[in-house]
Amino acid sequence: MPINITMPALSPTMEEGNLAKWLVKEGDKVKSGDVIAEIETDKATMEVEAVDEGTVAKIVVPAGTEGVKVNALIAVLAAEGEDVATAAKGGNGAAGAVPAPKPKETAETAPAAAPAPAAAPAPQAAAPASPAPADGEGKRIFSSPLARRLAKEAGIDLSAIAGSGPHGRVVKKDVETAVSGGAAKPAGAPAAAPAPATLAKGMSEDAVLKLFEPGSYELVPHDGMRKTIAKRLVESKQTIPHFYVSVDCELDALMALRAQLNAAAPEKDGKPVYKLSVNDMVIKALALALRDVPDANVSWTDQNMVKHKHADVGVAVSIPGGLITPIVRQAELKSLSAISNEMKDLGKRAKERKLKPEEYQGGTTAVSNMGMMGVKDFAAVVNPPHATILAVGAGEDRVVVRNKEMVIANVMTVTLSTDHRCVDGALGAELLAAFKRYIENPMGMLV
């Protein structure tokens, strides 16, 4: 029976992607773990691995196709011992499960003079591609199409099977092992998914365009990244009650320590092994502040308060067309030099769209620094599942009062945005006070 290859969900939030490149062609033999394609998501370009063995019988979605929905049929494999031509014909029946998206237009693509007539439907030789199953809590279970079919035939629950495929995906051999061992519980009806929250809509495009003279503008289609940013920020502002706390931090001691540490950096191949930035020290200070104020290192769910054991700090990085937030994991445990070198690597690969999902998804807090752009102060939008985000302004000379005398100091304004459901004003102020202590007494970050 043909094995359907469907558009994989490369992250829990992925809904669609662009099929950038096929690394196999029809007739090629593949085995589990072989890289077969490259998929562009809204944040990165990622490799897709085969999760079943077989021969590529038919490529359904051509390279360069945009907006391919998760679970849409993209190719058909002939199983071991199966006739490739027969498998290719059988795969046609599943192609109707999802409308085929249009290939990405190029300069060489000429518009069609007239729409082609619809092809007659092929005999249904294979079942339509089914959506990925979910466990009792509605969470997606990552599995191959063949594994889903075998599990259904055997009457076992995929959520009871530990996947051994790429990224924990349940594959054929996992189901066969479960069947022979009798370990999997009988499949039950999945719990009904809760109805999604209704979000308010803004002005329609027609309403907006009516306000401007024809010819005074051009329309630039939204790409996947911009759509995702818009969706998540609207959801954040409509579902998270934001609360803001600001404080001024003096930077003179931090700048002096930074210069001293950079001057003392050992060299390798004629280059210093690290070069600390102010932002590196901000990341460390926030991580230590969360360690000291653990009640602020949380995430909100409708059932529980998720208290995190480590400070995983996301750092907003501007990239063409939007931004991405790579994460420094367990930043409270890392040295300043380790944080600095890790951020340089993450930032470089972020701009190249080469980050893996686990490098930018999750985290427990975030830093958004616009100080290098001369911005004095601003407030950032909380990015769930975070409960906090720190907006960092520029350091500048200001007049401050010490011992009843006016002196000049290098001062930076920071604003903490919090999810008021789990971080109240007093708790936010406590976290910000701890951050300020580390910034103004930076030797504490070295011990």
UniProtKB/Swiss-Prot annotation:
Provide any one GO MF term from the record.
dihydrolipoyllysine-residue acetyltransferase activity
Q: Give all N6-lipoyllysine modified positions.
A: K43
SUPFAM superfamilies attached here?
CoA-dependent acyltransferases, Peripheral subunit-binding domain of 2-oxo acid dehydrogenase complex, Single hybrid motif
Extract one GO BP annotation from the record: pyruvate decarboxylation to acetyl-CoA
Q: What is this protein called?
A: Dihydrolipoyllysine-residue acetyltransferase component of pyruvate dehydrogenase complex
Going by the record, the broad EC class of this enzyme is transferase
Q: Which organism is it from?
A: Rhizobium meliloti (strain 1021) (Ensifer meliloti)
- Name the Pfam families on file: 2-oxoacid_dh, Biotin_lipoyl, E3_binding
Report domain Peripheral subunit-binding (PSBD) positions.
142-179
- Cofactor binding annotation: Binds 1 lipoyl cofactor covalently.
The protein's Enzyme Commission number: 2.3.1.12
Q: Where is the composition biased (Low complexity)?
A: 108-134
Give the matching CDD domains. Answer: lipoyl_domain
